[in-house]
Amino acid sequence: MTDGARVRTVLDTGAGRDGLVRRLVEVPAGSRFEGAAGPGGELWFVIAGAGWLSPGTAGQAVQVRRDTGLWLPPGAGYRVSADRPGPLRLDSVSLPAGAGAAGDATGPRLSELADRPVEVTGDRRFRVLFGPGNGCSTATQFVGEIPPGRAPEHSHPYDEVVLVLEGEGVLHAGTGDRPLAPGSCVHLPPGEPHCLENTGRGTLRVLGVFHPGGSPASKQHAPAS
């Protein structure tokens, strides 16, 4: 049930099958967003605003705010409301059916970005909100910071979706380039050579979710031409 909330699917990497599905959710003040996580579980991130999350229609509500990450195991119920003036804007990524491990928690779990340690790979920094050994055994959610410039082309062994939170840049992948700005969403299939270039003066800040889980630093560099 959305009751005034707006839900928009921006990417489905499996065309309705075993892929990652990214949705953007906007909950105005005075509205609510409730339901249950899909069969593979869902990773959420608060892009803007603040509000409250209850586990289903009962249970104690917890506050969520900008830069809060959430892991909802398969079938976990939720009810979200927005504080005034609103709206509460959420990123939601559904994992493939069967991805959620039976041993994962049965209720929603929260992770605050500011509480997570900074990790470094090359000149890029990231913080992992959820991943194997950190609340979600089957997928990883992280926020990365890319300084101005272009890194070497590389690929990853996992299936990844990236949402630009701040900054501007260019995605170099395949046979073409794609401009990036806040709200841009891209799919990086396993093994596809690519590079995210920061063409601005400030930091390019991105939200990544990939499956199966692991480290965002795991990559293979493309051979020199």
Q: Whereabouts are the PLM-identified features?
A:
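Short, conserved beta-strand element in jelly-roll/cupin
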Residues: E26-V27, A37-L53, V143-P148, S155-A173, ...
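Conserved short histidine dyad/triad with adjacent acidic residue
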Residues: V7-L11, V21-G38, T140-H156, P190
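Short acidic-glycine-tyrosine-enriched beta hairpin
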Residues: T57-G75, G174-G191
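A short, N-terminal "cap"/entry segment at the start of jelly-roll beta-barrel domains
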Residues: M1-L24, E34, R65-R66, P85-A139, ...
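Structural motif
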Residues: A50-W52, G77, P87, V161, ...
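Asparagine-centered strand-capping/turn motif at beta-strand->loop junctions
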Residues: V80-R84, N198-T199
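Extended, compositionally biased flexible segments
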Residues: R32-P73, R79-V80
